[in-house]
Structure formats: structure tokens, C-alpha cells
């Protein structure tokens, strides 16, 4: 009798443990505000020397972007950069960078140059020590013309230290024309 009572208590405890399992939505899955504007702010010696902007007020699909600046940099120069994310609604722009930085462990920015001689190194990390990319150092070498694909990837629970730019799903993707001269 004692043995069957103990076994019954174990089964009840195990079943109760399963039935109390929570199915809440984790904080890391929280939606951030829509991003339909981005500013890349370039500094030399701490002073802002240029800001390049892309805006697509109606978001993906619909109308084409209303603005994509050409990134123009000098050869043989090192820049520090900062990303400013914006949500544009009815002509009003609201900075939403903190919405993404507060969820840094689930996001990563990618800078993918083509046809231009620039080395881009992310200088900030998330709480797990993985690259984020809101801040970066850009070092140009020789003159040239090409493009820079700028991407923000959302990767809840899958972000790693050296992820491929296609891992996760895209929150933002802009192809900036670029010139080093």
C-alpha cells in the first residue's frame, strides 16, 4: 500500500508539473515599432561630417522609397558611424532606435558593400557578447563606385557570434548607392 501511494503521488506531481507549464509570450518576441526610415551618421574625431538617409514611409511593397541618399566618403579615411532608426507616419518622424537596442540579443545589422573598397567593423555588442552593429568603424581605401546593402535582421533565439546575413528575417533592407572619391 505504501509503495502504491508513493507511486501515485509521483504520478500526480509529474502530471501537475506538466499542467502548470506556462505558455507565455517571451519578452524577446515583443514587436518593435515599424522602421521605415534610417540615418547613417558618420563622424571623424567625434564631429559629425555627414548623414545619409533612406526613407520609405509606406514600408515594404506599395510605393518605392521616397529617399535613398548616395553615401559619399573620402578615400583613406576612417569614420565612426551610428545608426538612427525612425518610424515615419503621416509625415511625422519618430526615432525608434531604442526599440531595437533594447532587444539587441535578437537583432543584428549587416553592412554588405559591393564594388567599393571599405572595411566595416561593428563596434558594439549585445548582452551575450555577439555583434549588434548600431555602431561601427568604416575605413575606406581607394576611390570607387558601388553599393552598400544595409540590413537589420531579426533573429529571436537563433543569434550567434558569426551569423550569415541571411539568418533570421529582415526588419529592414536598403541598398544605398555608394561612392568613395
Question: Which residue ranges define each predicted feature?
Answer:
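Bacterial N-terminal signal peptides that target proteins for export
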Residues: 1-8
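Hydrophobic helical h-region of N-terminal Sec-dependent signal peptides
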Residues: 10-14
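First exposed extracellular module after export/assembly in secreted or surface-exposed proteins
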Residues: 28-181
Amino acid at each position: 500500500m505504501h509503495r502504491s501511494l508513493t507511486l501515485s503521488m509521483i504520478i500526480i506531481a509529474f502530471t501537475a508539473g506538466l499542467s502548470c507549464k506556462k505558455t507565455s509570450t517571451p519578452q524577446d518576441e515583443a514587436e518593435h515599432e515599424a522602421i521605415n526610415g534610417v540615418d547613417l551618421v558618420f563622424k571623424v574625431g567625434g564631429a559629425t561630417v555627414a548623414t545619409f538617409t533612406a526613407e520609405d514611409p509606406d514600408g515594404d511593397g506599395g510605393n518605392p522609397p521616397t529617399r535613398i541618399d548616395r553615401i559619399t566618403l573620402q578615400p583613406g579615411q576612417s569614420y565612426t558611424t551610428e545608426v538612427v532608426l525612425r518610424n515615419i507616419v503621416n509625415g511625422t518622424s519618430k526615432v525608434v532606435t531604442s526599440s531595437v537596442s533594447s532587444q539587441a540579443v535578437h537583432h543584428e545589422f549587416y553592412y554588405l558593400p559591393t564594388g567599393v573598397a571599405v572595411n566595416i567593423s561593428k563596434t558594439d555588442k549585445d548582452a551575450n557578447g555577439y555583434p549588434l552593429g548600431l555602431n561601427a568603424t568604416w575605413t575606406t581605401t581607394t576611390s570607387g563606385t558601388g553599393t552598400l546593402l544595409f540590413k537589420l535582421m531579426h533573429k529571436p533565439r537563433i543569434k550567434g557570434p558569426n551569423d550569415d546575413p541571411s539568418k533570421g528575417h529582415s526588419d529592414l533592407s536598403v541598398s544605398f548607392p555608394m561612392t568613395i572619391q
